[in-house]
């Protein structure tokens, strides 16, 4: 180890260099002046250690500079190899306490506060406490020569230990400068071995003052291990030859963060440093800049310099030393003993050093090997990269070329394989053909020939199959054993010794040579001639013997696979060949050269290898052919030889068999002939019958056509007469917007009725049944239709007059004009708005009022079919106001509306016409009985003072109280939402038709919902005399327009035009875009969603459970029972599309609780505040009797029977307690045992109190205690004051270094992140929000000890519910925090923060209960995920949403989602009570903070004004598109000023798409019928009820399966056409099944349309119980008891829907 100037330790904090003389004075005892011991005690053994220096380390020079610079902290490896400039001043960012201007002087004995030892100077290193150091050796022991002063050169650097055990370590020589904070200081092992580490304070003898020695003189001999060096004095020896100092090695510059290590530069001793370490005593103490601070820290003046010895003292010392030298008798013995011990120690040290050096050598070799390996690895990688750059493209191209070649070979193999497969197929076909010919052949020879051909073809096919199975085998891959690792070095390489392609197997012999056509033909001719000769009995011409002898000597060997061998024998020539010898004198022939012989030999080899196998193959084939021919000849010869044996009685038997066969064939022929004749005759008869039926059907069709034409003409005439007076078309056209109105087409011509009379019909009125449509002429039918139409008008007017006729004469006004109650023509008088109406009617509403008044004047009923939202209610109220104001007709008026709109009718009548008295007729039976007292009078005259004018009720109550309503005579009956009476077979329709009323007005926004039959029901209701229940008219409405639209488009268009003209006089319809200019647009948008993984799994499972064949069967021949089954499947599929949680909810789960809980009593008695007690107890209980648990059984529980219970506490905690305040004070005064209290900022009382508390209480006290010491880092932030610590807190090192105040000062920004790195990283990692991977399978409270004692219960409660402990862990409650704030308590008195740390998991927190994830709840449904993103955008845009659903359970799930997203919402469905609906709608209209309104499409789609919303979302569409239109018009109606956007959620590729397509078709039907346009492109094919099942089956299948269903249906229709009897039987069965079956698709479409106030099975609480007669009850009960009848409870879906709609009698 070199001790050159480059290895000098440097001071990272000292501002200036120390002089070399000062260093020498500090470290070299020989150059130190005599005096008292310094204040530090550096340990070193008294005897220097021998120089056990390794051989590779040069000896150090013993110059004073070397001695001074060799001691100190060993440098890092990087520091040993780096040289630095000598005059560079070190700079560093670390604080050096030795460079403080207020230098602390060494403490003296007078400055200590204890008499035991002097206080050492306080050093402030980078660590706040001293490092681990060995204790000071004891000088009293006998063997103190070697007591641990030696340390291993391989010194471990451990982090500093705890400051508790080393609060005041023994002094040691501090390092010359403060070391780098990265590693603790370590002494140089070389200097310690050489005895250079001892200080003057470790010398046992007093140091005698000596003269200073020159710098070139060493302080010891060169060899410190010499015996003379041990016994010699400290006198200087002769100067040895100086060793050359190695040149400092200057390495490359390091990073900027490491400052260069400067070389200590000697300075003149006259310029002492102003900032020196307190370790080195300065000759002149400098004046401190801050004396007050040093005084506060307990520092005193330095010790005065000791006086030198006098001459007398020196003389006495010399005398004593001479006396000692004169007694040498024991010196040799002591020397020998010391030498032996020294040699023992030296040997031990040598072995240790060798062991260490050996390990270091291995480590260096390993490091060098790794270094070289890394270096070579870099070269290898560089070479690989270079190779890739140079050869990479070529290698890639070669690989690509090989791949292309391999692909070509593969394609060739595939082609070869296909050709072979084709060959096999052709051979098998030839075999089949040959077998067929053999079966068909009459001759045995031909049959055998074909059989041989079949065998030959089969053999070829088998051979080809074998070749296909064997395939083309490539070269075999040899198994190469893996190479063993090379442990000897050198390079290794492998190569293939033999090329696998070089030893190929010999190829198979080629095929036999192809024959020419002439040869083949000659062979065929010879074979045919041989066959003819054989047939004639002659012997065929065989091959000559001489031809067979050619191959006599050729013997083929058995051939094995892959081996071809031939033996050839050549006959010797008959005559010897004379060989002429060449003359030696002849010239050299050119064929006698070596090349010639090589070529000659090669030719023979080629002949032997190639040509000989071919010849052998030809020979073998020829031999096989010859043997086959011989075999055939032998067979034929044997047959000819046995021909005489065939002459037997076989011919007679064959003749009899032939005769029997002919007889059977003749009999079958005549039977077949007779059957064909009979079938032909029957077919002719059947054709005649069919022709007759067809002619009859044509006649009936013509008759029905004329009958229908008569009915339509009659209706058209009636409409024409009424239209002239009502002028509905003018009313509609006058209110059309010119920009959007549809212009009249020229071809949309009205029927030409000519000049029709206005008065009474001159012709005779003919009943419909009396007309003969076969004999009558068209003119006669037209005249009868005109007469009937005029008669119908006259009957309507007479009926109106009869209703208004009273007992007295009709009232006339003063001018004698006719009263309005007497119907008459009013001409073109325009009616003004009534003054009673407190509202301003719009133009189109005033036109509607004129139209309604004209209807009333003519005594004709009508349908006001304005689009929803145009004010049909206001127009109806204005009619009643007009009648009351102009003509004094104050009622009674009857308004029947759905239950959801009753409040709306009452409010609007009261609001617009306050003078009209409204009687709300709903409630319980008792309430309605009281209400009937106001109007149940026979001769009441309704004037302005009448008890009521308008009665408002619902459809259900009209049906239930029909007996009371029929007693009244109603002036005007208004039916709101008239589609409720669309069924003419329901009891509701029949009951309302039987009311006595002058006029009926139907209000509906959708007159056509599902089919034309509904429109027919409405027309029949308003004009029973004209639109009566003729089957033909009903047939025309329901079938001709719908079913024949596809087949007869022209007829369909004509009928639609005529239908539109018929409807014109009775129905007034305006559309929003035509009449309401200020109404915003309505935009409809379909949002397609995809199924999630969970939904697809559910959907696939449902599809897999459906049998497609069953669907096809049900779709073709099924009835309504099958419809119910299919509808159940449809509902399941719709549930999957909405949300999979409709099938199975993700439940809240928790581990098994191995405990039981107390049962709670009734909460009804507890009031609003319920006390929930802790009652969880383990299933395992440890029961103890009271005698053991409370009465003397426990040793720690004091009592009258346990006198020894408090002995331990009394002795240990009271008598022997060293923490008592008195003991602490006395100990501090006497021996100073508690003297450290003054440096810990702790009082005696605090220490005594802490000793009596447990760990938790002490932790609480620490939290409450203010931590102000760490704030000094903020106050004292200068460099020189950075480590300032008050004296009273000197030992509170951790609190002084606390960084929390710095973090509290910076609450935000990057500095805050730096102080909270762990917290910031944890938060960004997302670990706290991750789902838990596992959880315990079971939990249980701790096992408790049970005892029948109140004291045991109290003790357990105190343990479990410790209030102070809970308050410390959880902090104050929110109520207490609020009280502290409201009371304005100072923050100093606030309770401490909660001590319980935050949970690691933000989701799970401290519990194991797992709640279903709402995020997964959203993402499990494709619809809900789309809706989530859509609602976020709508919320940001300030929109308000109406959200419609079909399923109540889906609304429940949506409520959970809205709660999760914190959206405010309201809900209205069928279960909402009637009185709550008004308040709910009012809240949504008046409170803008409500974002979403959840509605049921059936319950919330009628009679509600929700114009405050501008967005409508259909989560799932209704079966009936009209219901959706009514629902969206709740927002898009009169009063809406914003644009309304309608979103419809549809799941792609599911049943919802097919339902939506069907709904669009129905909407198109409505548009065509209402507008009267062309309907050629409209699908009117709504199937009949008998085959309605097909529509549902089509929803459940895909396109291919739908095509299969269509095909099966076509086959069924063809079968029914061919077998009419079977089809009639099937229809009968279907009809019977229909009567007992469930609901059909039609019922599904109409589901809930009439029961508007109830969208679910739960009653709303407002319905009235229906009274049933006793006789009916009795009859029903008897039927039930007999088993033949059904209970009153609806069993099928159809019955339930009918009851809900009121279509059937409740009895």
From Swiss-Prot:
Extent of Basic residues compositional bias: 505-515
GO terms of molecular function: ATP binding; ATP hydrolysis activity; ATP-dependent chromatin remodeler activity; DNA binding; histone binding
Record's catalysed reaction(s): ATP + H2O = ADP + phosphate + H(+)
Composition bias type Basic and acidic residues, residue spans: 78-89, 101-126, 516-526, 729-756, 1643-1656
GO biological process assignments: CENP-A containing chromatin assembly; chromatin remodeling; DNA repair; positive regulation of transcription by RNA polymerase II; regulation of TOR signaling; subtelomeric heterochromatin formation; telomere maintenance via recombination; transcription by RNA polymerase II
Binding site for ATP: 866-873
Compartments where located: Nucleus
Residues annotated as domain Helicase C-terminal: 1426-1586
InterPro entries per the UniProt record, alphabetical: DBINO, DEXQc_INO80, Helicase_ATP-bd, Helicase_C-like, INO80/SWR1_helicase, P-loop_NTPase, SNF2-like_sf, SNF2/RAD54-like_C
Sites bearing Phosphothreonine, chain numbering: 178
Aminoacyl-tRNA synthetase among keywords: no
Superkingdom of the organism of origin: Eukaryota
Function: ATPase component of the INO80 complex which remodels chromatin by shifting nucleosomes and is involved in DNA repair.
Protein name in the entry: Chromatin-remodeling ATPase INO80
């Amino acid at each position: 180890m070199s001790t050159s100037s480059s290895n000098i330790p440097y001071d990272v904090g000292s501002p200036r260099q120390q002089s070399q003389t000062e260093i020498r004075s500090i470290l070299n005892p020989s150059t130190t002046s005599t005096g008292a011991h310094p204040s530090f005690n550096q340990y070193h053994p008294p005897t220097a250690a021998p120089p056990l220096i390794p051989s590779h380390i040069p000896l150090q020079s013993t110059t004073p500079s070397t001695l001074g610079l060799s001691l100190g902290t060993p440098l890092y490896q990087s520091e040993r190899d780096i040289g630095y400039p000598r005059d560079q001043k070190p700079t560093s960012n670390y604080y050096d306490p030795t460079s403080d201007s207020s230098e602390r002087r060494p403490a003296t004995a007078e400055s200590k506060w204890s008499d035991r030892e002097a206080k050492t100077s306080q050093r402030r290193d980078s660590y706040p406490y001293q490092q681990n150091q060995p204790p000071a050796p004891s000088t009293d022991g006998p063997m103190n020569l070697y007591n641990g002063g030696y340390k291993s050169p391989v010194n471990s650097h451990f982090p500093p230990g705890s400051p508790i055990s080393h609060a005041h370590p023994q002094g040691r020589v501090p390092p010359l400068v403060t070391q780098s904070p990265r590693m603790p200081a370590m002494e140089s092992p070389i200097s310690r071995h050489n005895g250079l580490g001892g200080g003057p304070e470790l010398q046992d003898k007093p140091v005698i003052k000596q003269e200073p020695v020159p710098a070139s003189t060493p302080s010891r001999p060169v060899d410190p291990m010499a015996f003379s060096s041990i016994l010699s004095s400290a006198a200087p020896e002769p100067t040895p030859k100086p060793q050359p100092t190695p040149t400092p090695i200057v390495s490359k510059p390091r990073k900027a963060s490491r400052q260069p290590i400067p070389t200590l530069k000697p300075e003149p001793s006259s310029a002492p440093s102003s900032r020196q370490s307190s370790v080195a005593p300065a000759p002149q103490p400098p004046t401190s800049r801050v004396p007050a601070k040093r005084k506060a820290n307990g520092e005193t003046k330095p010790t005065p310099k000791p006086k030198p010895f006098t001459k007398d003292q020196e003389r006495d010392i010399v005398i004593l030393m001479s006396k000692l030298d004169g007694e040498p008798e024991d010196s040799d013995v002591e020397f020998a003993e010391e030498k032996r011990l020294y040699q023992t120690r030296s040997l031990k040290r040598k072995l240790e050093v060798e062991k260490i050096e050996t390990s270091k050598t291995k480590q260096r070799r390993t490091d060098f090997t790794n270094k070289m390996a890394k270096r070579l690895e870099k070269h290898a990688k560089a070479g690989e990269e270079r190779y890739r750059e140079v050869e990479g493209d070529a290698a890639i191209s070669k690989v690509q070329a090989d791949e292309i070649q391999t692909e070509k070979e593969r394609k060739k193999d595939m082609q070869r394989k296909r050709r072979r497969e084709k060959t096999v197929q052709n051979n098998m076909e030839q075999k089949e053909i040959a077998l067929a010919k053999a079966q068909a052949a009459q001759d045995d020879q031909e049959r055998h020939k074909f059989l041989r051909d079949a065998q030959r073809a089969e053999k070829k096919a088998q051979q080809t199959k074998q070749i296909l199975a064997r395939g083309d085998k490539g070269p075999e891959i040899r198994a190469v054993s893996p190479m063993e690792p090379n442990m000897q070095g050198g390079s290794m390489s492998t190569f293939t010794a033999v090329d696998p392609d070089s030893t190929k197997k010999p190829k198979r012999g080629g095929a036999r040579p192809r024959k020419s056509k002439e040869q083949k033909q000659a062979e065929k001719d010879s074979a045919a001639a041989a066959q003819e000769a054989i047939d004639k009995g002659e012997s065929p011409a065989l091959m000559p013997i001489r031809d067979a002898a050619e191959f006599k000597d050729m013997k083929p060997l058995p051939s094995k696979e892959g081996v071809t061998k031939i033996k050839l024998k050549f006959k010797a020539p008959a005559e010897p060949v004379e060989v002429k010898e060449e003359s030696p004198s002849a010239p050299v022939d050119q064929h006698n050269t070596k090349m010639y012989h090589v070529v000659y030999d090669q030719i023979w080899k080629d002949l032997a290898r190639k040509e000989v196998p071919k010849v052998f193959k030809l020979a073998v084939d020829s031999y096989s052919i010859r043997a086959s021919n011989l075999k055939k000849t032998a067979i034929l010869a044997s047959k000819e030889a046995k021909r005489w044996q065939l002459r037997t009685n076989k011919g007679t038997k064959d003749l009899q068999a032939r005769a029997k066969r002919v007889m059977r064939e003749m009999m079958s022929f005549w039977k077949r002939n007779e059957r064909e004749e009979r079938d032909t005759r029957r077919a002719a008869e059947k054709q005649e019958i069919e022709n007759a039926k067809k002619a009859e059907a044509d006649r009936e069709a013509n008759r029905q056509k004329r009958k229908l034409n008569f009915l339509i003409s009659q209706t058209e005439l009636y409409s024409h007469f009424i239209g002239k007076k009502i002028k509905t078309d003018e009313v509609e056209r006058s209110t059309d917007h010119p920009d959007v109105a549809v212009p009249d087409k020229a071809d949309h011509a009205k029927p030409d009725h000519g000049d029709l009379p206005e008065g009474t019909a001159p012709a005779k009125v003919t009943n419909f049944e009396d007309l003969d449509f076969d004999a009558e002429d068209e003119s006669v039918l037209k005249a009868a239709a005109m007469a009937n139409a005029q008669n119908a008008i006259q009957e309507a007017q007479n009926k109106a007059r009869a209703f208004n006729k009273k007992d007295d004469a009709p009232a006339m006004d003063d001018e004698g004009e006719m009263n309005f109650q007497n119907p008459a023509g009013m001409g073109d008088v325009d009616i003004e708005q009534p003054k009673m109406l407190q509202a301003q009617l719009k133009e189109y509403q005033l036109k509607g009022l004129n139209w309604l008044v004209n209807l009333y004047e003519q005594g004709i009923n009508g349908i006001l079919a304005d689009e929803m939202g145009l004010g049909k209610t206001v127009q109806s109220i204005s009619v009643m106001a007009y009648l009351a104001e102009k003509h004094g007709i104050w009622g009674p008026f009857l308004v029947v509306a759905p239950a959801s709109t009753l409040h709306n009718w009452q409010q609007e009548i009261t609001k617009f016409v306050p003078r009209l008295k409204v009687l709300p007729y709903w409630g319980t039976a008792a309430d309605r009985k009281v209400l009937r007292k106001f109007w149940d009078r026979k001769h009441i005259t309704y004037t302005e003072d009448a008890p009521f004018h308008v009665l408002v009720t619902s459809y259900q109550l009209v049906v239930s109280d029909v007996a009371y309503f029929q007693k009244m005579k109603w002036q005007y009956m208004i039916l709101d939402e008239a589609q409720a009476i669309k069924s003419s077979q329901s009891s509701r329709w029949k009951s309302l038709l039987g009311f006595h009323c002058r006029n009926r007005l139907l209000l509906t926004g959708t007159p056509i919902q599902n089919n034309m039959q509904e429109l027919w029901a409405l027309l029949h209701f308003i004009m029973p005399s004209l639109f009566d229940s003729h089957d033909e008219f009903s047939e025309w409405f329901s079938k001709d327009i719908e079913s024949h639209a596809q087949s007869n488009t022209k007829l369909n268009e004509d009928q639609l035009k005529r239908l539109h003209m018929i409807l014109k006089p009775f129905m007034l319809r305006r559309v929003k875009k035509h009449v309401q200019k200020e109404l915003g647009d309505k935009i409809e948008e379909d949002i397609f969603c995809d199924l999630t993984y969970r939904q697809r799994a559910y959907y696939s499972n449902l599809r897999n459970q459906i049998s497609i064949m069953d669907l096809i069967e049900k779709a073709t021949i099924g009835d309504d029972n099958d419809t119910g089954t299919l509808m159940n499947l449809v509902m399941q599929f719709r549930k999957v599309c909405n949300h999979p949680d409709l099938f199975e909810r993700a439940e809240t789960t928790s581990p098994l609780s191995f405990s039981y809980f107390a049962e709670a009593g009734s909460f009804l008695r507890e009031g609003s505040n319920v006390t929930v007690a802790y009652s969880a107890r383990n299933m395992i209980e440890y029961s103890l009797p009271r005698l053991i648990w409370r009465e003397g059984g426990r040793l720690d529980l004091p009592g009258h029977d346990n006198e020894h219970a408090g002995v331990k506490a009394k002795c240990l905690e009271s008598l022997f307690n060293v923490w008592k305040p008195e003991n602490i004070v006395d100990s501090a005064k006497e021996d100073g045992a508690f003297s450290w209290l003054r440096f810990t900022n702790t009082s005696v009382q605090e220490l005594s109190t802490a000793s009596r508390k447990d760990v938790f209480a002490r932790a609480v006290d620490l939290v409450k205690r203010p931590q102000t010491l760490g704030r000094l880092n903020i106050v004292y932030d200068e460099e020189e004051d950075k480590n300032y610590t008050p004296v009273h807190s000197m030992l509170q090192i951790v609190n002084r270094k606390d960084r929390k105040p710095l973090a509290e000062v910076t609450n935000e920004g990057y500095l805050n992140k730096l102080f909270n790195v762990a917290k910031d990283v944890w938060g960004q990692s997302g670990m706290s929000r991750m789902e838990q991977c596992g959880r315990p399978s079971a939990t249980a409270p701790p096992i408790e000890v049970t005892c029948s004692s109140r004291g045991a219960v109290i003790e357990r409660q105190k343990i479990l519910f410790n209030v102070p402990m809970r308050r410390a862990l959880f902090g104050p409650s929110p109520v207490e925090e609020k009280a502290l704030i409201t009371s304005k308590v100072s923050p100093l008195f606030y309770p401490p923060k909660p001590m319980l740390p935050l949970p690691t998991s933000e989701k799970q927190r401290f519990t194991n209960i797992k709640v279903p994830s709402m995020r997964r709840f959203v993402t499990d449904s494709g619809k809900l995920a789309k809706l989530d993103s859509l609602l976020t955008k709508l919320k940001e845009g300030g929109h308000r949403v109406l959200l419609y659903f079909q399923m109540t359970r889906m609304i429940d799930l949506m409520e959970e989602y809205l709660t999760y997203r914190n959206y405010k919402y309201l809900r209205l469905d069928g279960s909402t009570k009637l009185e709550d609906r008004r308040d709910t709608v009012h809240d949504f209209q008046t409170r803008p903070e409500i974002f979403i309104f959840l509605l049921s499409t059936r319950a919330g789609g009628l009679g509600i004004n929700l114009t405050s919303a501008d967005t409508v979302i259909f989560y799932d569409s209704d079966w009936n598109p009209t219901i959706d239109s009514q629902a969206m018009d709740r927002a898009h109606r009169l009063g809406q000023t914003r644009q309304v956007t309608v979103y419809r959620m549809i799941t792609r590729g599911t049943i919802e798409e097919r339902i939506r397509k069907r709904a669009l078709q129905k909407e198109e039907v409505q548009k065509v019928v209402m507008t009267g346009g062309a309907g050629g492109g409209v699908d009117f094919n709504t199937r009949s009820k008998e085959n309605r099942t097909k529509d549902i089956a089509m929803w459940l299948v895909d396109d291919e399966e739908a095509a299969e269903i269509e095909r099966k249906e076509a086959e069924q229709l063809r079968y029914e056409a061919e077998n009419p009897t079977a089809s009639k039987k099937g229809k009968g069965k279907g009809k019977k099944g229909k009567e007992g079956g469930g609901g059909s698709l039609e019922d599904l479409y109409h589901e809930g349309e009439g029961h508007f106030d109830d969208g679910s099975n739960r009653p709303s609480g407002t319905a009235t119980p229906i009274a049933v007669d006793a006789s009916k009850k009795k009859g029903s009960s008897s039927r039930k008891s007999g088993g033949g009848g059904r209970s009153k409870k609806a069993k099928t879906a159809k019955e339930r829907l009918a009851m809900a709609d009121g279509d059937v009698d409740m009895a």
